[in-house]
Amino acid sequence: MLDSLDLVIDTIVAREVLDSRGNPTVEAEVLLEGGASGRAIVPSGASTGAHEAHELRDGGDRYMGKGVTKAVDHIEERIAPALCGLSALDQGSVDAAMLELDGSDNKSGLGANAILAVSMATARAAANGLGLPLYRYLGGPMATLLPVPLMNVINGGAHAANNLDFQEFMLVPHGAPNFREALRMGTEVFHTLKNLLSERGMSTSVGDEGGFAPDLGNEEAGEVLVQAIEKAGYKPGEQISLALDVASTEFYSDGRYAFSGGSYSSAEMVDQLEQLVNRFPIISIEDGLAEDDWEGWALLTERLGKRVQLVGDDLFVTNTKRLQRGIDANTANSILIKVNQIGSLTETLQAIDLAGRSGYTSVISHRSGETEDTTIADLAVATRAGQIKTGSLSRSERVAKYNQLLRIEDELGDQAVYAGATGQGPRGRD
């Protein structure tokens, strides 16, 4: 019989490991009194929002300044003594203790990478201690909804060394009957796309997130994706639609958007996006405008918010204060959820909850610098978010999340419901 003392935190260890770009990141391991343990590794981003929680790096020459030994030391020397003796079941208290110890507004005291690693590892240790899968521990008996994947098959912007301005062109197989079929559909289009690019004499090398990185214009990318969907035997807009991550903050300066050889005002940028929506089966646009262009976002929401899911990534940075500002101003209609933007599991769950109560969708997301950690797959099911964005159909750190979702779907059996089959995937908002 399980004793409550078995779930008390006994030891916390941390180490510096590598992410998918060969950069150091933080791994934490939480061991409980009863012998159960949980391990987690934090990701890192390339196109990071100015309002994200602080990722602590060492500086200096080692690893070109990107080492994380300071964050590791903070876990073992400051966080561990504060948390040992607390129950791993009380996630809120564990995270609150770390936030109090940090003492800053943006987690610069301990480092968001240190706090998040311990936060996620604690949840996994608690789940293991109870003998539950992580999605069930976090989500309870209602955790049965498998997410629609937003598959980043063409990479540009900060994620690839090519001339493509927009950062991500994604496949959205919302017309599948279940997650397994959605994954198959996306994979078949991915391989068809590779053949089409090869026939055009274009590069089929891949970017940070496993998608192809050819030298294409934004409209050319849309055209070749629609062609790949059709050639693979699917109906664009009906079975598989498109999603964009414009990452417009990356080319925004002095109130103008500079891309494709032009310079555009916020209103002109909205015009550009509307033209793309009119031409292609696009159902979701992420970061269509810059992170602090609130007036532009209001116009974008007015023009396209009923037709298209408008996702705030840099705009909201998984932060309830910024999300509440957007809700109050009727800006965007969806939030991208990145656990390392806010830096703790509790705050991540609070952001998802606020979005849901306000009629906003949530898209659970990876980062461009990923690892083999599959927490976000379980998180997507646990929160019934209905959508996950975890890269292309290549590179093991991306596929690991898809494979975990396959396992979860199998484990749920007849209880499993695919969000696309119930209309709970990407959508606009009246």
Curated annotation (Swiss-Prot):
Cofactor(s) needed by this chain: Mg(2+)
InterPro entries in UniProt: Enolase, Enolase-like_C_sf, Enolase-like_N, Enolase_C, Enolase_CS, Enolase_N
The UniProt record lists the keyword Transmembrane helix: no
Subcellular location as annotated: Cytoplasm; Secreted; Cell surface
Gene Ontology cellular component terms for the protein in this record: cell surface; extracellular region; phosphopyruvate hydratase complex
Primary subcellular site in the record, as a coarse category: cytoplasm
Reactions catalysed: (2R)-2-phosphoglycerate = phosphoenolpyruvate + H2O
Residues that, per the record, bind Mg(2+): 245, 286, 313
Enzyme class: lyase
Biological-process GO terms, alphabetical: glycolytic process
List of catalytic residues: 209 (proton donor), 338 (proton acceptor)
Positions with a binding annotation for (2R)-2-phosphoglycerate: 167, 338, 367-368, 389
Keyword list, A-Z: Cytoplasm, Glycolysis, Lyase, Magnesium, Metal-binding, Secreted
Molecular function as annotated in GO: magnesium ion binding; phosphopyruvate hydratase activity
Pathway assigned in UniProt: Carbohydrate degradation; glycolysis; pyruvate from D-glyceraldehyde 3-phosphate: step 4/5
EC number(s) stated in the UniProt entry for this protein: 4.2.1.11
Cofactor binding note: Binds a second Mg(2+) ion via substrate during catalysis.
Family per similarity comment: Belongs to the enolase family.
Protein task: Catalyzes the reversible conversion of 2-phosphoglycerate (2-PG) into phosphoenolpyruvate (PEP). It is essential for the degradation of carbohydrates via glycolysis.
UniProt cross-references to PANTHER family, sorted A to Z: ENOLASE (PTHR11902:SF1)
Name the UniProt record assigns to this protein: Enolase
Organism: Synechococcus sp. (strain CC9311)
Record gene name: eno
